[in-house]
Amino acid sequence: MRVYEALKWASSFLQENGRDENAGEIVLCHVLKTNRTGLLMNMREEITAEQETSFTEFIHKHVEGIPIQYMIGHEMFYGRSFFVNEEVLIPRPETEELIVGVLERIERHFGDEKLHVADIGTGSGAISITLALENKNLHVYTVDIAQESIEVAKENAKTLGAEVTFYHGDLLSPFYETGQKLDVVVSNPPYIPEEDWRGLSPVVKEHEPKRALVGGEDGLDFYRRFMEELPNVLQKKAIVAFEIGVGQGEDVKGLLQQAFPHAHVEVVFDINGKDRMVFAEIE
């Protein structure tokens, strides 16, 4: 079997079974230990019988519901490869837009000041590690309630050469317990309503950690808790940045305005035109 034949088969098989037809390309890159460019340049190359077997097994497992990223053990985020397993949420492209928004506002709000930044809900470390690598003026802390997630993120920080301080704890508790003040707080908290979670694709519901996805009956539980804790840990001049679920923009904006009446609060839409981020600039 040639490369192009393997891709053609996978695309058709995945489509027939309601999966993303592009997943075959990701899997074949992994099996052949190459990148997309290498794949495209060698479309007529023969793959070995062993590679073909491995490739078809991966594709069949994905059709059964296992996410590709957990099978191959990594996902690309902001141009870097992050190790992932079933203890952490798979990083999404939408969260890259959150990173862009945070970095832009830091530059506008603080210039090149040295800042204390916290990412709440570590997961794979995609947010905290990316911020630390993209802006060397940031002292980045990150907190997760699950030690298993922290271990994954620590491995990513070591592999990618990022300096991040890890805390095992619940939301902002490590900071108000120590009196540490923060200039920037970023979070992609669990925001899916309980009822919506029940209707998710089995690929997500049966494999990604529920604790990283569900935010109570209306999806807003964690944002409400943040509003109780943020005033205790923020500097007078600060930035708060949240990723949100579709349709939650005005609710989260309202919560932030209630907690910080003089802040400039903005709902930002993602590349698909959906409300996806809320930023508060506090003076």
Curated annotation (Swiss-Prot):
Coiled coil: none annotated. Keywords: Methyltransferase, S-adenosyl-L-methionine, Transferase. Gene3D superfamilies: DNA helicase RuvA subunit, C-terminal domain, Vaccinia Virus protein VP39. CDD domains: AdoMet_MTases. Substrate binds at residues 188-191. Its EC number is 2.1.1.297. The keyword Cell membrane does not apply. InterPro entries: DNA_methylase_N6_adenine_CS (IPR002052), HemK-like (IPR004556), N5-glutamine_MTase (IPR050320), PrmC_N (IPR040758), RF_methyltr_PrmC (IPR019874), SAM-dependent_MTases_sf (IPR029063), Small_mtfrase_dom (IPR007848). GO terms for biological process: methylation. GO terms for molecular function: nucleic acid binding; protein-(glutamine-N5) methyltransferase activity; protein-glutamine N-methyltransferase activity. Pfam families: MTS, PrmC_N. S-adenosyl-L-methionine binds at residues 121-125, 144, 188. It catalyses: L-glutaminyl-[peptide chain release factor] + S-adenosyl-L-methionine = N(5)-methyl-L-glutaminyl-[peptide chain release factor] + S-adenosyl-L-homocysteine + H(+). NCBIfam families: hemK_fam, RF_mod_PrmC. Belongs to the protein N5-glutamine methyltransferase family. PrmC subfamily. Methylates the class 1 translation termination release factors RF1/PrfA and RF2/PrfB on the glutamine residue of the universally conserved GGQ motif. PANTHER family: HEMK METHYLTRANSFERASE (PTHR18895), MTRF1L RELEASE FACTOR GLUTAMINE METHYLTRANSFERASE (PTHR18895:SF74). This is Release factor glutamine methyltransferase. It comes from Bacillus anthracis. The gene is prmC.
